[in-house]
UniProtKB/Swiss-Prot annotation:
A Pfam family recorded for this sequence: Globin
Protein name in UniProt: Hemoglobin subunit beta
Family that this chain belongs to: Belongs to the globin family.
Gene3D superfamilies: Globins
Designated gene of the protein: HBB
Native species: Anas platyrhynchos (Mallard)
Keyword terms of this UniProt record: Heme, Iron, Metal-binding, Oxygen transport, Transport
Lineage, top ranks: Eukaryota, Metazoa, Chordata, Craniata, Vertebrata
Source organism superkingdom: Eukaryota
Keyword DNA repair included in the entry's annotation: no
Function text: Involved in oxygen transport from the lung to the various peripheral tissues.
Length: 147
């Protein structure tokens, strides 16, 4: 079980309250697909992903990005039970979608970049440390079914 300090919880929940889930989620997923183009193979049903412009303008990328970041909200709400919170998603991504679990870490790193870009003043080194811990814990929980 992961131990969260009161300060970490405050930094995570405080920033999360300011996040526009639709915009940040869309940006995070689009960045993942652009920066790590091999991840596009998991999104073949999304249509045109042929260029950064196409990816950024793709409504399915935007919708799924919102869905992904909404699930991060579940982690924020359940900091003391992230493993169980993501048990079904781990099973889905492992057994049905066959997603490389390394992609969860990559998405977490991308999310950190998006948050830093959107919240320059609030995203202090202490805030980043708390969020790095969160994305690492979420990635581990999503990869759990693979072990």
């Amino acid at each position: 079980m992961v131990h969260w300090t009161a300060e970490e919880k405050q930094l995570i929940t405080g920033l999360w309250g300011k996040v526009n889930v639709a915009d940040c989620g869309a940006e995070a997923l689009a960045r993942l697909l652009i920066v790590y183009p091999w991840t596009q193979r998991f999104f073949a049903s999304f249509g045109n992903l042929s260029s950064p412009t196409a990816i950024l303008g793709n409504p399915m990328v935007r919708a799924h990005g919102k869905k992904v970041l909404t699930s991060f909200g579940d982690a924020v709400k359940n900091l003391d039970n992230i493993k169980n919170t993501f048990a079904q998603l781990s099973e889905l991504h492992c057994d049905k979608l066959h997603v490389d679990p390394e992609n969860f870490r990559l998405l977490g790193d991308i999310l950190i970049i998006v948050l830093a870009a959107h919240f320059t003043k609030d995203f202090t080194p202490e805030c980043q440390a708390a969020w790095q811990k969160l994305v690492r814990v979420v990635a581990h929980a999503l990869a759990r079914k693979y072990h």
